[in-house]
Amino acid sequence: MAFYAYAAKAVEVAVNVDTGEVQVLRCYGATDLGKAINPKICEQQSEGGMAMGIGSALYEETVIVNGLILNPSFTDYRVPLAAQMPANECMQSIFVESAPHKDGPFGAKGFAEGVVTGMEPAIANAVYNAVGARIKELPVTPEKILQALRGGS
């Protein structure tokens, strides 16, 4: 049995062209749920997933050199701080309750993965739309943005 749920993301960013820093100002996540059993929990799951996607897009990277992980702990592994997240009122979850899924509990579909995926390309494309820097490798770092703005690859 498969639960095919669809999702889409949109983000608004501000990019500092002097430093390459990106701030996600607003983000929207639309998800097909089938039937939302508990809409508040669905909203919290969606916003948590968008936050995870922001971390994946802008900060998180496992650095490996000669087979050795150079950032094996949260001391060295970058994750976003609360101050680097959009304000709660700037994260919006949009739920599409399609026909109840015949095999899902009470007609619901699984949607946990869909709330994370899509943030990375949405952020990379928002950076491109804002300043013309096309970043093709995650994370989208200030260094990569500045290099792209200077004409590097």
Task: Annotate each predicted stretch with a short phrase.
Residues 1-153:
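C-terminal catalytic domains of large/alpha subunits in multi-subunit enzymes
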